[in-house]
Amino acid sequence: MRKAYLAIICLFTGFNAFAQHTDIQPVPQQISESGQLITLPGSYQFTGDTEANPYAVQQLKQLLAGNHSAKEGLRIYIGEKGDKAIRKFARRIPNQKEGYYLCINDKEIVLAGNDERGTFYALQTLSRLLKDNQLPAVEIKDYPSIRFRGVVEGFYGTPWSHAARLRQLKFYGENKMNTYIYGPKDDPYHSSPNWRLPYPEKEAKQLQELVKVAKENEVDFVWAIHPGQDIKWNQEDRDNLLAKFEKMYDLGVRSFAVFFDDISGEGTNPVKQAELLNYIDENFVKVKKDVTPLVMCPTEYNKSWSDPKGGYLTTLGDKLNPSIQIMWTGDRVISDITQEGIRWINERIKRPAYIWWNFPVSDYVRDHLLLGPVYGNDTRIADQMSGFVTNPMEHAEASKIAIYGVASYSWNPEKYDSEKTWKDAIKNIMPASAEELEFFAAHNSDLGANGHRYRRDESVALQPVAQSFTDSYIKGEKYNENDYAALQETFGRMAESGDILLTDAENTPLVKEMKPWLTQFKLLGETGEEVLAMAKAYAPFVRKIEIEVETLDQVKEAVEAGADIIMLDNMT
């Protein structure tokens, strides 16, 4: 009877019954709350913890400090659909992959996943809700809108360090991202000429650790190979590729990708590419049973580079096994994903595209930090994409601002709020200095002029003020005092924010990455303050000097006119 009563408490908490005030990223599909806050008692009765996702159980017990074997206390139900412990909540669990049901009230907490990853995501939501040993009474029914969500380390330049990758994987798990594609362009064992060779022992052990940490955070570690520049379309290289995959499989890798991007020559042949990929799919992926669908990046990976007459994309669409995922960057190398654009590519490849979004990657504008909001992608096309991964900067910690936004967008595009998510990302990454980081990021978000013609908003509030002040000053008119005050405040904040962030000990890897830009930001603020002071001191004399210059010009004209008259008199 007691169990039935407890179940009814959750089941009768109808969705949309209460105003939604709880702040969670990514935004859940459905959430309702009563307004009640529950203080955690410190003693808990666990049910299902021996059957449920072990990584979720471990983190849950770390989160809920106290006695986990109490005879009396807050009841915790945890498990996956089909487990006895959560059977009575089965109807509330979403049917979608990675979906979960979370219910919190003063009698119990229920974390019920459609699968193990769903249970893990229920825990991540619970973790976000916990503040000062209190939880809001809520009922959440949630699932991702896009199947594969995450990051592709696919930029040119200095690859991320091992420590940075470990931090990244934990970050992905916390933000419900399930994919990390390892494909750094400057890894010699990922690409030509060494793709056929096994990793040296040190690098192999590091990859093994990455795979382990990825698994603990419910992230698929996708190892990518880039063989196209020197591959031979023969059985020997087929065997070489499978042998390399076997080596990676032995290291724990269970997800694989083959990249044919940024190459030329014979390796670009779509028929041969399709034959090779199908061979891998049939002789490796399907044989292993525990390997996720194969992913490929085509040579014509954006619309502007495609040749419809050549039939490259339609060949892949016709010949590739249906389970193989095809990556796509959009209308151009660097572009946002539109409804029209996704429809165009899907018609040709005959499957939902797997989006490789080239933001905030900065390997073509390396003097810029791209710390602005994630925006521009259509929010109505989730069902037309099989995956959405972001290509980041070589600055791993700084990339987390955009990665956080992509996590939120790809989980629930229809409820995605770019500005709010951006602010939340900054608070998540550097809570104590969030105000200063937000100010710095607002002035470090655009790429500047570049060959890809891709731009982002930057210094939005400052630009009209600066333009108004400058125009007035150049014309010799009295400038607007409000403009002057706004500029003075901005330059002052630049100097102050730069100084605070440079000495911040909260996120030292982030500060280290941003240090050159922070130093410049601080100096720009200090210089701006000095220039404004000089401009103010000089302003009263501007019109006076202009009048004197005009007078001198008139005198000069008169003198020159008089000289001309004298010359004419002498000639006559």
Model-flagged regions — what are they?
Residues 218-221, 291-293, 350-355, 538-546, ...:
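Short beta-strand/loop segments at the ligand-binding rim of alpha/beta enzyme cores
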Residues 1-23:
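Bacterial Sec-dependent N-terminal signal peptides
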Residues 251-254, 263-421:
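Catalytic-core regions of glycoside hydrolase
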Residues 529-571:
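Glycine- and Gly-Pro-enriched alpha-helical subdomains that act as flexible
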Residues 160-171, 237-247, 312, 338, ...:
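Short, acidic/polar
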Residues 89, 94-237, 244, 250-254, ...:
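Feature activates predominantly on carbohydrate-active enzymes
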Residues 418-533, 537:
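C-terminal functional modules
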Residues 17-106, 114, 132-140:
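Acidic, contiguous N-terminal accessory segments
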